[in-house]
């Protein structure tokens, strides 16, 4: 594939880049269908990860837990954009791949890439082998809900992706990080939160 093929490069949301991409090589509708199929599959896995790992309970007062959650996000390099102790909401973001390290992102991408390519191949054939995940041009958004509950405080984390650079094409955007990246990120949030809780004399979170 020559310069024309290289000029076909497209990015689709969370940083789906098809290296010599699909511009004049594959119909726009086909490209859109391919990315939307990946969106559906990864959304299902995303919801499974949050359902099994996203919520825990802390046996401590709400103000203590709220401040520990806030400190957790800051410690992981996130910028707090919105917080309301009354509503129990904290929203923070950071350029991708944080809160993952570059090595963690690469590990997650390697785990999820075979499935993404298999889904893409149904629509674009061998061009799916040029498909990869990259974090550039994206931010990771963490939403934390910190709510009083009988016996303590319930904490829930959600991790989404937002495009911060203007898209270079009209391809559909991906809203979900690779599922393995979500699992790694959520686990990292809990590990950091538990350290913060211990530093405040509170017990760690429990499932």
List PLM regions with ranges.
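Ser/Thr-rich, low-complexity intrinsically disordered terminal regions
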Residues: 26-207
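Bacterial N-terminal signal peptides that target proteins for export
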Residues: 2-14
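C-terminal motif of bacterial Sec signal peptides marking the signal peptidase cleavage site
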Residues: 22-24
């Amino acid at each position: 594939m020559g310069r024309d093929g290289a000029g076909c490069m497209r990015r689709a949301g969370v940083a789906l880049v098809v290296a010599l991409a699909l511009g004049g090589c594959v119909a726009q509708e086909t490209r859109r269908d391919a990315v939307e199929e990946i969106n559906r599959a990864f959304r299902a896995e995303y919801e499974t990860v949050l359902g099994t790992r996203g919520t825990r309970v802390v046996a401590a007062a709400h103000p203590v837990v709220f401040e520990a959650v806030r400190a957790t996000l800051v410690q992981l390099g996130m910028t707090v954009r919105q917080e309301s102790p009354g509503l129990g909401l904290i929203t923070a973001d950071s350029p991708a791949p944080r809160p993952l390290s570059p090595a963690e992102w690469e590990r997650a991408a390697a785990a999820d890439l075979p499935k993404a390519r298999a889904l893409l191949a149904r629509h674009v054939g061998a061009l799916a082998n040029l498909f990869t995940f990259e974090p550039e041009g994206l931010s990771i958004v963490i939403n934390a809900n910190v709510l009083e509950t009988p016996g303590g405080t319930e904490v829930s984390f959600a991790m989404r992706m937002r495009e911060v650079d203007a898209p270079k094409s009209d391809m559909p955007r991906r809203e979900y990080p690779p599922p393995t990246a979500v699992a790694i990120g959520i686990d990292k949030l809990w590990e950091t939160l538990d350290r913060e809780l211990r530093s405040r004399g509170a017990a760690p979170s429990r499932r």
